[in-house]
Amino acid sequence: MNPVVLTIIISSLGLGTMMTFIGSHWLLVWMGLEINTLAIIPLMIRQHHPRAVEATTKYFLTQATASALLLFASITNAWSLGEWSLLEMLNPTSATLVTIALALKIGLAPMHFWLPEVLQGLDLITGLILATWQKLAPFAILLQLHPMLNSNLLLFLGVSSTVIGGWGGLNQTQLRKILAYSSIAHLGWMITILHYSPNLTQLNLALYIIMTLTTFLLFKLFNSTKINSIAISTIKSPLLSIIALITLLSLGGLPPLSGFMPKWLILQELTKQDLAIPATIMALAALLSLFFYLRLCYSTTLTMSPNSIYLSSSWRTKSLQPNLILMMATSLSILLLPLTPTIFMLTL
């Protein structure tokens, strides 16, 4: 892609997100979301492949529907209250419509149908942007509106997302679909705790972005899009395969890695709010997600792809070296658990 065009696209992504962050008027916030959506479409379709075209079309139609619903909700709220301010969402119907629209935008269950198919049709770098940066603007709105949103609706969206995210990834062999269902499950944890502790939502979102960034970069270095294609990662780079193992376990939420921290704090907060049953369901759903993370770990570090003795030795391939961004993201993905007491005090 032309560097000038790429610079304009990346700048537009940043501009749209910043407009949503700083905007207090509903039309300004809506414009920021639309700029975000339109800016990523050229990145999605740059491959000129039928799968990329299909994924881009699905993404555009879904985001257009969510944007129309969001605009309708804001107009309804302004009509009933005479106020366009973002923080004056006092109409219960409008607040519910905003929640549904933003859930559709980020891919929460049961509005998740588009995310696995869209992510499967993209390359890994564009998929990384879709799975991380594109979540920031909708979550900025949700964090500002959390006192006015229906807690029961948020709880339903969160619990169903954790269950469907874990269940949907069990039978997948495509890495991008597995990461899509992983994203759905993590978003479920964030939405569940949003009404009770928005600080925990921000913590979970930050750790999710760091761990997802590490995972996508590793798969990009391995040049892998299927489970069976990462079996030779140990041959390409033993160090990177070990990093991938630890990062995937952190995504699964195993102690003593960083990914355990938000799950621990969220389950603790839900129990304090007398929500033991949803907390139990989410803890059990996390085991479903852990199962397909362990499948990836097994394929990455404990298996090798079939290799004929008549072929040249596969260990003579060019060695892969981790870059600075990957090493920093990996460190944050696996080493933050000792900070839990301090973070717990900050989230009170």
UniProtKB/Swiss-Prot annotation:
Keyword Transmembrane, does the record have it?
yes
Can you provide one Gene Ontology molecular function annotated for this UniProt record? NADH dehydrogenase (ubiquinone) activity
Topology in the lipid bilayer: Multi-pass membrane protein
Subcellular location(s): the record lists: Mitochondrion inner membrane
Extract the InterPro entries matched here. Answer: Complex_I_Subunit_2, NADH_DH_su2_C, NADH_UbQ_OxRdtase_chain2, ND/Mrp_TM
* Enzyme class, broadest EC rank: translocase
Q: Which coarse location class applies to the principal site listed for this UniProt protein?
A: mitochondrion
| EC number(s) stated in the UniProt entry for this protein | 7.1.1.2
- Which GO BP terms, alphabetically? mitochondrial electron transport, NADH to ubiquinone
TM spans (from-to): 3-23, 25-45, 67-87, 95-115, 118-138, 149-171, 178-198, 203-223, 240-260, 274-294, 324-344
Q: What does this protein do?
A: Core subunit of the mitochondrial membrane respiratory chain NADH dehydrogenase (Complex I) that is believed to belong to the minimal assembly required for catalysis. Complex I functions in the transfer of electrons from NADH to the respiratory chain. The immediate electron acceptor for the enzyme is believed to be ubiquinone.
Its protein name is NADH-ubiquinone oxidoreductase chain 2
The species is Squalus acanthias (Spiny dogfish)
